[in-house]
């Protein structure tokens, strides 16, 4: 698969987007500089997830941005998403690869150095590592810190996307580790200024030296 731009990886949040126009929210994030969109919903019916995924895929296709579905391979297949992102307790990566083939993207969450080492021999396109900072969007997240991220950057053979509590205030410190790919949730969808929030993150990344 052609290497994709993982630099500003935006993940949806069902609580933050509750009652809002999903198409408009995703379009604003993309207009602000998002390079990947991941749809994550843990507490919705399959029917509702399918309906929302169809909408998100439509806007991602309009702007030629990769669309990833969190966990649910069935939803990803149903809407012909570009790929899936799996957690450590989700479907085995090698099984997912057999189902999806090598044209689709598979990402894998990692929390520990051991997870990263194991992922090196798995058929994944990138890994997510974190939580790098304390986060409010995942209650069970383990805080890893920047020193661990530095280790991961040296060990991983796949592109690394840092995740967890990343915002305008700590992004520069994160970039100093050498990591150039970040996943964000609240930093983008915390209020109605989605495009502006995304633009500020993008500007920090582009101006970092």
UniProtKB/Swiss-Prot annotation:
UniProt record, GO biological process: thiamine biosynthetic process; thiamine diphosphate biosynthetic process
Sites where the protein binds Mg(2+): 71, 90
A GO-annotated cellular component: cytoplasm
Pathway assigned in UniProt: Cofactor biosynthesis; thiamine diphosphate biosynthesis; thiamine phosphate from 4-amino-2-methyl-5-diphosphomethylpyrimidine and 4-methyl-5-(2-phosphoethyl)-thiazole: step 1/1
Pfam families linked to this entry: TMP-TENI (PF02581)
Cofactors that this protein relies on: Mg(2+)
GO molecular function ontology, one term from the record: thiamine-phosphate diphosphorylase activity
Residue numbers binding 4-amino-2-methyl-5-(diphosphooxymethyl)pyrimidine: 38-42, 70, 109, 138
InterPro entries in the record: Aldolase_TIM, ThiamineP_synth_sf, ThiamineP_synth_TenI, TMP_synthase
Alphabetized UniProt keyword annotations: Magnesium, Metal-binding, Thiamine biosynthesis, Transferase
Gene3D superfamilies for this protein: Aldolase class I (3.20.20.70)
Enzyme Commission number(s) from the entry: 2.5.1.3
Coiled-coil residue windows: none
Reactions mediated catalytically: 2-[(2R,5Z)-2-carboxy-4-methylthiazol-5(2H)-ylidene]ethyl phosphate + 4-amino-2-methyl-5-(diphosphooxymethyl)pyrimidine + 2 H(+) = thiamine phosphate + CO2 + diphosphate; 2-(2-carboxy-4-methylthiazol-5-yl)ethyl phosphate + 4-amino-2-methyl-5-(diphosphooxymethyl)pyrimidine + 2 H(+) = thiamine phosphate + CO2 + diphosphate; 4-methyl-5-(2-phosphooxyethyl)-thiazole + 4-amino-2-methyl-5-(diphosphooxymethyl)pyrimidine + H(+) = thiamine phosphate + diphosphate
Binding site for 2-[(2R,5Z)-2-carboxy-4-methylthiazol-5(2H)-ylidene]ethyl phosphate: 135-137, 165, 185-186
Cofactor binding description: Binds 1 Mg(2+) ion per subunit.
Origin: domain of life: Bacteria
Role, per record: Condenses 4-methyl-5-(beta-hydroxyethyl)thiazole monophosphate (THZ-P) and 2-methyl-4-amino-5-hydroxymethyl pyrimidine pyrophosphate (HMP-PP) to form thiamine monophosphate (TMP).
Family classification: Belongs to the thiamine-phosphate synthase family.
Protein name: Thiamine-phosphate synthase
